[in-house]
Swiss-Prot record:
UniProt protein name: UPF0225 protein Ent638_2310
Disulfide bridge map: none
Organism: Enterobacter sp. (strain 638)
HAMAP family listed in its UniProt record: UPF0225 (MF_00612)
Superkingdom in the source lineage: Bacteria
Family: Belongs to the UPF0225 family.
Amino acid sequence: MTQLCPCGSALEYSLCCQRYLSGDQLAPDPSHLMRSRYTAFVIKDADYLIKTWHPSCQAADFRQEIVSGFTNTQWQGLTIYETSIGQTAKEGFVSFVARFIEHDKPGAIIERSRFILEGGQWYYIDGTRPQFSRNDACPCGSGKKFKKCCGQ
């Protein structure tokens, strides 16, 4: 039985993010790194998350917070709605919605993540949370208003 990749690519996990999480390959661009990091949250792989955070973030120092975050969170889906190159080819941005249920309540992370290419490897470095009006179209692509979708 084949398992679809949690990242939402509609590919089998073995043909998608598994190669990055196993360390067989590096994610070739920010979009693939974003998808593989989302998958790491779904399958609770703190080591991969720490390895793909930029070293300046010192993610290993908050390993316990990462692991404890796995306990009550069930990830429901990822929608990438924009990718862009930064001021140089060594910087990229991915805007996304990651839906989850935590303590039986639905939620969403809406972020514009920044990635840096260093030493041939892409790293997550930081992100900003865009603000949406309650009556804006939801960025997840559902066609609903933000207040009736991810903004609940």
